[in-house]
Regions:
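N-terminal regulatory/effector-sensing and dimerization cores
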Residues: 2-99, 133
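An amphipathic alpha-helical interaction segment
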Residues: 103-158
């Protein structure tokens, strides 16, 4: 599922219980993720991942402009199918050798989006405006596959 969220006003910290994983992009404003008293800011132009479970977040609009984000929600099964397709269909060598304390100890990860990612989310934004995904699961799966490929193809951010 691909969704665009637009938040015109600051509404404070909200609790979310995600039943799916999510990869998102902050189009405008900033997102704050809270762990106890610690706030992690995710600024405009940043890609983020949030795992399943409870999250405490706040979406902060820019001065006079809406907060905007685009989020891809997916299950572990969907990700498995996409990774299998990329591995078998395109002989992509997929490994999980990334390891750093920042990524392992949190249920979210964020990093600045590359120009390719910004262009990708710009295209997705236009597709959402044109309502291209509402009745077309194939288009949504293709975009999700493209997103996963782009993430795998870039260098580690840490």
């Amino acid at each position: 599922m691909i969704v665009k969220y637009v938040q015109p006003d600051r509404s404070g910290i909200q609790a979310h219980n995600f039943t799916r994983h999510s990869i998102g992009y902050v189009v405008r404003g900033k997102k704050c993720v809270y762990y106890g008293d610690v706030c992690h800011e995710i600024p405009q132009g940043t890609l983020f991942y949030m795992g399943m479970g409870n999250h405490y977040t706040e979406d902060v609009p820019e001065q006079g402009k809406n907060f905007e984000q685009i989020v891809f929600y997916y299950t572990s099964d969907q990700l498995s199918r996409i990774l299998n397709h990329l591995s078998v269909g395109y002989q992509l060598n997929i490994t999980n050798d990334h390891s750093c304390p920042n990524c392992e100890n949190q249920s979210h990860v964020s990093y600045p989006a590359s120009n390719i990612m910004k262009n990708f989310f710009g295209t997705v934004n236009q597709y959402l405006k044109d309502d291209a995904f509402s009745q077309d699961n194939t288009a949504e799966t293709i975009k999700m596959t493209e997103l996963i490929y782009l993430i795998l193809a870039q260098k580690d951010c840490c």
